[in-house]
Amino acid sequence: MSYNDGSEEENDSNTYIHDEKKKKKKKNNKNAYALINEVNYSQEDEQEVIHNTNSEDETSNRKGNGCVYSLSDQNVEDHIISLPEYLDLINNNNNNSNSYKMKKEKKKKKKKKKNQTDEENMKNKKDHIYQNNITNQQNDIKNDYKKINHHNMNNKKNKIFCQDDQNIFNINHTFQIHETVQNNLIIPPSETCLASDIIQPSDTTQSNTYLNEATASQNDDNNNEDSSNEMGMFKKIFYRIKKIIVDKKGTPITNENDVDNDMCELNVMENNMNNIHSNNNNISTHMDDVIEDESNEEVFVINRNTDGYINTRENINVSTHVTRQMINLSELNPNDLLCNVSEYEEGQNINSLWNDNNNNNNNNNNNFLVGSLNALHPINHNLRNENIHNDNINNTHINYDNNNSYESPIHILSFSFKNIYNKISSYINEHITHIKEKIKKYWLERVQEANTQLNSPRPVHTRNTTNINTNININEDENDDPSCVQILFFMGLICKFPILWIIGSIVFCITPSEHRKTKTWSLVNTFFALLSIIYFITTTNFRLRKPTFFVILEQNVENKNTYPKGILKYNNMIHHKHIIIDQSSLHKWKDLHTNKVYKTSENYFLNRNFLSSQKPDSNILLSDTIYKLLNRIQVTVTFGKGNIYSSDNIEKIKPFFQNLRINMDPISYDKLTMTDEDIPDDFFGSGLRCERTYNNHNQNINEPQQNKEKEKWYLFWKEEEINNSHNKNIYNISIPVGEIFFFKSEYNCRIAFLYPKSILYDQNDIPSNFVEIQKIIIKPF
């Protein structure tokens, strides 16, 4: 290239720019760069040679020849100089040309370093991918395979590829990697980025060639490289987001999810397989034609390697020869396939479903298809699977007994019970709806009558009562509606004590004289309500408790001080309030004869537990505490669980308690005559045992008289209430029994607990001749 030639082109361009001004400026720029384009064209041949070699040869050539570089599109643009720089070169501006050359050399050095770093990065990436492909385990490859299937599922939803988990995994990887092998599957361009990550260890050489071609194509066009890097970044970001969502929420629920652990996966595939009779030749091209002709058809690929209908997970990496079966089912989706499988399980339509396919295929293919269908739903119903082996090599044939029923007796019973339940429920629903319709129809008629009455000028009822003899229509008042009174009548018959029935009947009686029906029904209600009340009173036993103690004292007797107020001394102290003896506090009891002491506590107070735990020697126990009583004193004993003391036994002790009370006066304790020897052996209940204390002025009384008045007893027993006729429930009822005594002189008294001598302590249940004591009250009155 000479500078003179450049000057001539400069003059031509300047004159041309002056004539055409700014309109033809772009065309002149092209003429100015003509020489540079020639240089670029001469270097394109070298670029093609360099691209045909691998990346390692390129680095060696560049290091050996410092001035020669492989020029891609980006490098060609670097050699293009601007117009002012070109004019300076033409005008022999040596200084500018030298500076430009220096800048150009610096740029070349920087680009050389950049290319070297890029080449090193690519080599590192290749080595890293190569090592990962060698060291990756089987589970990682399986996960990548599932990702590809999930990616293909989003693109094609009408293609179902049903295979055994491990066999389809090995076969599909060999199809995707070995593109030169016959019977391959064509990977679309959208899946090349994912296919590069799925390389088995046995195919390392082919993975290297694949990566070298990728790097060579990447070095050809840097602009395309930038765009592809951006697309790769977006794919990585999208993949990470997708992975996070799947880790948190799980895989999306689609038709390929497993129903059972043994159910095969329904994976959506991008590629279609060819027909069964093509003998595995030109699979991809033939199936593309099929897709163009029949766009609505679905292709099912069924590969099976079963051992007695049990999926084997052994020898995953062993490349075994497995025949591939193709079945075309028109107008089906995954749900239809599952429905057909369920029909096969019941043994109803399986022969008609696969009839055409069985006529075209050989026995091996038929066995292979049946085994895969059994794996979809691994329930064997009358199948002869005696000769089925691991690899389905032998020509075994599975016979189906269509004459036999596939339903078990349990299934028949459940089916019959379900039918009975459905029939009963449908019958009830039909009758309920029929009754509802009748009620609805009745009220609609009433509403229509009300509307006609409102629209008519006079309140004339549409339904007129006719007299048979006279055939005279009687007008009825619209407000004379006895429906509410009728409802009240039927509700009153249900109630046991119909107070509201009577009140409602009286209220409805207060109606105008024209409302004859309402009045008649109100009178009927009142009459029956009164009858029900009378019947209720006569048949009901009202249980009125007898008062514990009730004494009426005349005012003059109190004024005369005949019965002065009582005094209660306890532990040498006078108590104006009452004393309570129960299980809330600890009390001591001693034997009447041996003076042995027994203690009572919570849940062990004068009951069956107390006797079975303490087992006293005597049948009479006295309180260890002495209570000094004077004047009017009230003593009350509350009995718990136990029977009443029989009337026959009461007759035996009745003479000791006759003629003690005069009218409503207190019982004078001095009149009591019962002693320790008079107490019967079979008595059970409580008692008050008192002994008189002699003061100094009574010392003149002789000793026989003192011995005669030594102790006096008054007994308390559980008795039936006067107004209570429920004798059966008295066993569990707590009944208080009390009496008011008058002590003229001071007595030392003890509370007594009595039970029969013949009682058994080890008896579990409460005996019939025993009663518990819950509480004892002593109160000055």
From Swiss-Prot:
State if Transmembrane is listed as a keyword.
Answer: yes
Q: Which residues cross the membrane?
A: 487-507, 520-540
Which residue stretches does the UniProt record annotate as biased composition, category Acidic residues? 1-12
Query: To what use is this protein put?
Result: Possible candidate for an effective malaria vaccine as determined by epitope response in sera.
From start to end residue, where is composition biased (Basic and acidic residues)?
Answer: 115-129
The Low complexity compositionally biased stretches are 91-100
Cell compartments where the protein resides: Membrane
Which stretches are tagged as biased composition: Basic residues? 101-114
Q: Which GO terms describe its cellular component?
A: cytoplasm; membrane
Its name, as the record gives it, is Uncharacterized protein PF3D7_1205000
Annotated keywords: Membrane, Merozoite, Transmembrane, Transmembrane helix
Q: According to Swiss-Prot or TrEMBL, what is its membrane topology? A: Multi-pass membrane protein
Is the keyword Membrane in the record? yes
Q: What is the lineage of its organism?
A: Eukaryota, Sar, Alveolata, Apicomplexa, Aconoidasida
